[in-house]
Amino acid sequence: KAIRRQRQMCIRDRSYTHAAENKTIRISTDNTDLVLQVGDNGRLYQTYLGERLLHEQDLNNFSWSIHAGADGSVSRRGWEVYSGSGNEDYFEPAIAITHNDGNPSTILYYVSSSSKAVEGGMETVINLRDDKYPVDVTLHYVAYPKENVIKTWSEIIHQEKKPVMLSTYASTMLYFNNSAYYLTEFSSDWAKEAQMSSQQLQFGKKVIDTKLGSRAAMHTHPFFEVGLDQPVREDQGSVLMGTLGWIGNFRFIFEVDNVGNLRVIPGINPYASNYELKPNEVFTTPEFIFTLSNDGAGKGSRNLHEWARNYSLKDGKGSRLTLLNNWENTGFNFNQEILTELMKEAKHLGVDMFLLDDGWFANKYPRKNDHAGLGDWDVNHNKLPGGIPALVKAAKDADVKFGIWIEPEMVNPKSELFEKHPDWAIMLPNRDTYYYRNQLVLDLSNPKVQDYVYSVVENIMKENPEVAFFKWDCNSPITNIYSPYLKNKQGQLYIDHVRGIYNVLKRVKENYPDVPMMLCSGGGARCDYEALKYFTEFWCSDNTDPVERIYIQWGFSQFFPAKAMDAHVTSWNKATSVKFRTDVASMCKLGFDIGLKELTADELAYCQTAVANWKRLQNAIMDGDQYRLVSPYEGNHMALNYVSKDTNKAVLFAYDIHPRFQEKLMAVKLQGLDPNKQYKVCLLYTSDAADE
């Protein structure tokens, strides 16, 4: 009886809150609605997030007052859109500020909202304000109807007399009321990126975060999936897929409350990052990008892929360059003659470009290994007496483009740069210094360091305007966390350092908009959509073993289109055939890092044919819709297919991962084809030496 009375009271209270003054804000895609409402208390609440409502009047069926629990303090509180610390809520807030008088509370009230058309969608801007302190928060939501993607971020500003201290600053908050929640996360390590694992979320908090600073995603990636009511499945069920556009420390909080509702709170990790915000200074959070798919993760991935190509990825609609890299051919040991021969091999292979990797720079402390030279970006004259201009000319003579590797955010203590500017490195005073890969991270919170890092690209391009590509690496997390530049504001280092990186990348893009760049971080430890505004692609992993790459590429494909993912044919796992290695790399942006002279005539011919076919099929693989058909996590096989936008062409990749005992192979049913068309099926990649 008590339960029945409580339910009746809920119904009466909900009808009461549907007063005319309870302004409703609807943020819509073609498939999803996010509905917000101003409560009777003047604060803003989420009332609905789910499948798009069919009728406008359906909005009247939702109320801000959700009766979150039996405890009186929260029984009339709803799902506050940007909850502040110190209010009547018992759960994790989105924002925490310590004001000039020491008060640690922030309560935000609705002020106004507006909407405007932007490229590809509609932006809704909502203004909130604390009624006791001069603090304003602006919430931004950009809805992309066709792609079913919503991008959201927040801006914080105040007009107090002195700086306030920000200790929490989430990008947004989302709420769900389902019977169960199943989280898929993506763990990582060197050569072990994007490993998927799932668990059911129970009462309490699950936190995914990183504290590594620059190479931030080395152990976990900034994206996740949440299955609603059931575990995440490929082709059916409701799934939230979210990713944060931030190259630095991030944090995802998943909090299941006392009545089984889920709060999802993405943002910068506030670890060691109490941020002193000056009056009238705007603190902008990273963008959180999400899609809510009712047709499984496969549809959610296609949503994100299309959105990325259209609106986020640099040159998202352009073609990509196939290449030959010298790293596994030569390591640090090369000269001008060796590189010139490799350029000729690149042309013979049929790729578009030769990419020169690490080891081309530094004179006083030559880059003979990874112990010296980082920071000194003048060409090593013993190795390359003609400098970069001679290499660009040699590439042009070979009829291939020329690209080059840089790692401008780093410095070796054994370098001229460190001798001149030791205060430019992030390094603790009065402590033993810890080196990761024999190097330190430059302090990009310092504007002078930003100028220097930008000059690395500028100097190369001024001398060699025909350089066609940069591979931008970052091999170290931040160690010895201390900024000589920030002095007594060390809580800002993790954030201002990342903002400094973005400042440099913006300058590079503004001045060299047509130069493609690969984002690399000791493999795939950098893979976010803010960085990919400035990079055409990213290096998924140093692990190019085709068996392991199947899993790595499967994981990254959940959030990134194939044209953003680099995959190279190398000598890793020589027990597998060259064909197998080439086929796996062909699922993404194809490249080679292998000695062509090591190949047999048949293997070389196969690679040449594969390059030609990949170029011919690039519009389907790079720009088509991807359908993941058979998961390597569920057995000994893997299959996926791409379908061109006009559905006239499709490409199927299917693998027997560990062939044993002539095991039975199962038929694969393709997806995405037009049932009203007839297709001719051709086996493109054949080889007598095939082992899959």
Model-derived features: positions:
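Catalytic cores of secreted or luminal carbohydrate-active enzymes
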Residues: 583-626
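Aromatic-lined carbohydrate-binding/catalytic grooves of carbohydrate-active enzymes
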Residues: 317-394, 398-455
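Polysaccharide-binding surfaces and accessory modules of carbohydrate-active proteins
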Residues: 16-28, 32-35, 44-255, 271, ...
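Short Pro-Gly-centered flexible turn/kink motifs
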Residues: 106-107, 275-294
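Carbohydrate-binding surface patches
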Residues: 31, 224-226, 234, 631-674
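Single conserved hydrophobic/aromatic residue that forms the stacking wall/gate
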Residues: 1-7, 11, 685-692
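Active-site neighborhood of glycoside hydrolase catalytic domains
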Residues: 430-569, 598
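Conserved, mostly hydrophobic/aromatic
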Residues: 31, 154, 280, 395, ...
